[in-house]
Amino acid sequence: MSKTLSFKTYSAKPADVERKWYVIDAEGQVLGRMAAEIARVLRGKHKPQFTPHVDTGDFIVVTNAEKVALSGNKENLKTYFSHSHYPGGVRVDSVKDLLRKKPEKIIEHAVWGMLPHNNLGRQLFRKLKVYAGTQHPHEAQAPTEMKIH
């Protein structure tokens, strides 16, 4: 008798997932390309046991957020729009202002737009840590450096 072949789809369990820590230096990196790679790793799509409804991704620490590069003339033209839901509560911030005040928000906003907008996406987003300088408080996790091409 020959053994029958099984074609069952593997579904990852949260307990089976091994998480790694990566650190990315944002200096000179193009924002959109870097954000796409970060979203892919946060989601876990780089792993063979990727399962769409399970958090299989890794942690990412981004440093030098204030030195991120934008292609074209986006530094002068791109704006971020938000509203407080009160009359006259419109707020429009330019990239130039955000780079000066809160450079972490630019990377967080770009990555959030590339993640699922549901409970899983919020859980994935919590694994992203962005810092303006070169220092970060995650040395104890021994993150490995990730290069983005």
UniProtKB/Swiss-Prot annotation:
Keyword entries, A-Z: Ribonucleoprotein, Ribosomal protein
Alphabetized GO MF terms: mRNA binding; structural constituent of ribosome
The keyword Ribosomal protein appears for this protein: yes
A GO BP annotation: negative regulation of translation
CDD domains registered for this protein in UniProt: Ribosomal_L13 (cd00392)
GO cellular component: cytosolic large ribosomal subunit
Family: Belongs to the universal ribosomal protein uL13 family.
Function: This protein is one of the early assembly proteins of the 50S ribosomal subunit, although it is not seen to bind rRNA by itself. It is important during the early stages of 50S assembly.
Complex formation: Part of the 50S ribosomal subunit.
Gene3D superfamilies: Ribosomal protein L13 (3.90.1180.10)
Protein's name according to its UniProt entry: Large ribosomal subunit protein uL13
Domain of life: Bacteria
